[in-house]
């Protein structure tokens, strides 16, 4: 057990109640569940709570499309979400809904405290209004032509093509996405939360270590531009909570959504006599509160939410942990390619523990995106879990049952056990700091040691020699003891496997009994614990996830189908980068072969005071360091680059600049200014590797 018991409340971001869970969502819930299970394994009081985010215009409109009431729809979605989570072995202490009595009461209470303290302001604003549906239109429910690049069919807040942000009123030829009608301008009184009043507190809190440095650096832009009052109201019709003393006005979904953390925990406390809500949420609480979220919602959790809590007299979160997005096979999830995979589709074909392990093996405490490479996924699971971990037991357990009455021997040489136990605090620290990938590497390195031990000892040979029965008994018992330690270390990641191993070993796997002496202990007969992934199962997932594009083609016959790549050129999308920056003239392979492209880690990045566009980078090639001046200052802060892997031209002739010598070039994509992205290789790549 850990030195002293901590009181911890941990949350994941609330899934929106208008659709199913997919594998992009699952990253966060798996990450949080692993961390929560680890805390409990260490003996801490840890409560993992969540809820469906059940309010807002999208839910109201989706229910209308289905011809049912929003309450009916969110109840059905809640049931589906809970089943998906349960089948992925996500163990919430409570999963609730923001459309609850507890959340209504807490939202009203917090709002009134903010209002009475002078933090709520009102003013009249003009918004686009759908005259056919008699409703004001949120940003994402207005579409039109981008005022910057003139791309059609863009949302009312930003352009998917050029990345520009703007107001819905800036769109050219705007249309309601609800009815197709041309919206009109209409005035309405709105309620605003006075976020600027908390600027000093937020400036200090965001630099206190409560959030990752990358996030703090990003939020610095908000402070540089000056915090603005936050619109927290929406007009009827709207599915949500009506604002106290304001008929026809509703809380914006992002006001009551984070309060849903409190509402879900209040619901749990009301059902348990041993839990007190104020112990975790009062201003003077000594408990720890952690939020796991995606990097796309950091502004809500790291600015608006702590300010609301501060203004209403509650404690702020201990930390907010953000993670990156999930890509599949190096690209954004795609319905047409079958890589937009729903949790249920995955569960119909593969063991959830496979994905839990793969995500854990690639997760760090940074906000880098995680790529689910499906071939690598199969290879890593088959190699690590089946080939290394489970194989350790399958190669030795049968001998214990058949030759030694199922009983383990007293281990004479405990050298290996001591090596394994010496890693427990290293592994614990990695779990604690959310460095799951590093923890998995430590554990698999131990698995390699154990397998090498068994291979060298060859109990299948020893067992044939009557004079070496004791030695065979020792080897098999030692191997199973090492296997027990490994599975205990992996228990937060692989809870179902751990349950099965506990049944097989007939012994509980806890952190406290890692060093237990199992001499004379009887185990059950070994049964297969895990099967290898067959690529046919992955192919089945992809096929089941593909959209039926035939209907789309038939519904729009006036749109010509693209010609076969074998018979004609593929037309260039007018919004494609190829349109403005065509492919260069062909070069010979010999010309290309002259380039020496290498993986490099950005060891250090710093500003060049004399240059407006350059950053000075120290690139580690795994034994050699090169200095490069890169024109990426408009897109990156130096601190956001340090530690990242990238690709560089390593054999470019050094170029003397007035700031110093540049010894190569890093590769980046994009048109320029803020739209630049350095190339980041798969995390399996190592500094110094050649790109070929």
From Swiss-Prot:
Per the record, what are the reactions this protein catalyses?
A: tRNA(Met) + L-methionine + ATP = L-methionyl-tRNA(Met) + AMP + diphosphate
Q: What is its main location?
A: cytoplasm
Region called Disordered, residue ranges? 552-577
Q: What EC number(s) is this enzyme filed under?
A: 6.1.1.10
Which InterPro entries does this one have?
aa-tRNA-synth_I_CS, Anticodon_Met, Met-tRNA-synth_bsu_C, Met-tRNA_ligase_1, Met-tRNA_synth, Methionyl/Leucyl_tRNA_Synth, MetRS_core, MetRS_Zn
Kind of enzyme, top EC level?
Answer: ligase
Q: Where does ATP bind?
A: 335
What species was this sequence derived from? Shewanella sediminis (strain HAW-EB3)
Lineage of the species this protein comes from: Bacteria, Pseudomonadati, Pseudomonadota, Gammaproteobacteria, Alteromonadales
Q: Could you cite one Gene Ontology molecular function of this protein?
A: tRNA binding
Q: Could you tell me what this protein is called?
A: Methionine--tRNA ligase
Ranges of biased composition (kind: Basic and acidic residues)? 556-566
């Amino acid at each position: 057990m850990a030195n002293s018991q901590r009181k911890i409340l941990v949350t994941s971001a609330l899934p929106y109640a208008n659709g199913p869970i997919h594998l992009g969502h699952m990253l966060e819930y798996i990450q949080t569940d692993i961390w929560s299970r680890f805390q409990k394994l260490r003996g801490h009081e840890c409560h993992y709570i969540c809820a469906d985010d059940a309010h807002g215009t999208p839910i109201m409109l989706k229910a209308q499309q289905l011809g049912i009431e929003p309450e009916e729809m969110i109840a059905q979605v809640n049931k589906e979400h809970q089943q998906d989570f349960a089948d992925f072995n996500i163990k919430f202490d409570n999963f609730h809904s923001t459309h609850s009595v507890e959340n209504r009461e807490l939202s009203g209470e917090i709002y009134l405290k903010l209002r009475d303290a002078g933090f709520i302001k009102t003013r009249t604003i003009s918004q686009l209004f759908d005259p056919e549906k008699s409703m004001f239109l949120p940003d994402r429910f207005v579409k039109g032509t981008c005022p910057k690049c003139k791309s059609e069919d863009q949302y009312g807040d930003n352009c998917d093509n050029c990345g520009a942000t703007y107001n819905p009123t800036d769109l050219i030829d705007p249309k309601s996405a609800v009815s197709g009608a041309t919206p009109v301008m209409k005035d309405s009184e709105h309620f605003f939360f006075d976020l600027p009043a908390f600027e000093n507190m937020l400036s200090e809190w965001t630099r206190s270590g409560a959030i990752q440095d990358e996030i703090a650096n990003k939020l610095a832009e908000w402070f540089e531009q000056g915090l603005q009052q936050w619109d927290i109201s929406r007009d009827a019709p709207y599915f949500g909570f009506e604002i106290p003393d304001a008929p026809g006005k509703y809380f914006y979904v992002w006001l009551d959504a984070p309060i849903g953390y409190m509402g879900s925990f209040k619901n749990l406390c009301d059902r348990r006599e041993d839990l007190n809500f104020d112990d975790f949420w009062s201003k003077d609480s000594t408990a720890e509160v952690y939020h796991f979220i995606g990097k796309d919602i950091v502004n809500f959790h790291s600015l608006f939410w702590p300010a609301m809590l501060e203004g209403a007299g509650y404690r702020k979160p201990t930390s907010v942990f953000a993670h990156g997005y999930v890509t599949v096979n190096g690209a954004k999830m795609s319905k047409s390619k079958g890589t937009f995979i729903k949790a249920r589709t995955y569960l119909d074909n593969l063991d959830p523990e496979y994905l839990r392990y793969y995500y854990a093996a690639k997760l760090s405490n940074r906000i880098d995106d995680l790529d689910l490479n499906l071939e690598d996924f199969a290879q890593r699971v088959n190699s690590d879990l089946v080939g290394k971990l489970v194989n350790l037991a399958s190669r030795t357990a049968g001998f214990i049952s058949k030759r030694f009455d199922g009983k383990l021997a007293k281990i004479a040489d405990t050298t290996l056990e001591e090596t394994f136990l010496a890693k427990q605090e290293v592994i614990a620290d990695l779990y604690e700091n959310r460095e799951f990938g590093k923890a998995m590497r430590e554990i698999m390195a131990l698995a390699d040691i154990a397998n090498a031990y068994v291979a060298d000892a060859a109990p299948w040979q020893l067992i044939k020699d009557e004079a070496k029965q004791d030695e065979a008994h020792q080897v098999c018992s030692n191997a199973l003891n090492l296997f027990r330690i490994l599975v205990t270390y992996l228990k937060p990641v692989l809870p179902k496997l751990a349950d099965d191993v506990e049944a097989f070993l007939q012994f509980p796997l806890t952190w406290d009994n890692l060093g237990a002496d199992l001499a004379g202990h009887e185990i059950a007969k070994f049964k297969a614990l895990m099967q290898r992934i067959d690529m046919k199962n992955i192919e089945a997932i992809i096929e089941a996830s593909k959209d039926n594009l035939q209907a789309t083609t038939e519904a729009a016959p006036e749109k010509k189908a693209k010609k076969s790549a074998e018979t004609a050129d593929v037309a260039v999308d007018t919004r494609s980068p190829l349109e403005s920056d065509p492919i260069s003239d062909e070069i010979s392979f010999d010309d290309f072969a002259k380039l020496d492209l290498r993986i490099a880690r950005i060891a250090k990045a710093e500003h060049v005071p004399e240059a407006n566009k350059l950053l000075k980078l120290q690139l580690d090639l795994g034994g050699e360091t090169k200095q490069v001046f890169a024109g990426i200052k408009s897109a990156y802060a130096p601190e956001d680059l340090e530690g990242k892997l990238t690709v560089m031209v390593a054999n470019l002739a050094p170029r003397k600049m007035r700031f110093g010598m540049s010894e190569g070039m890093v590769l980046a994509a994009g048109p320029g200014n803020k739209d630049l992205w350095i190339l980041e290789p798969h995390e399996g790549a190592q500094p110094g590797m050649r790109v070929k």
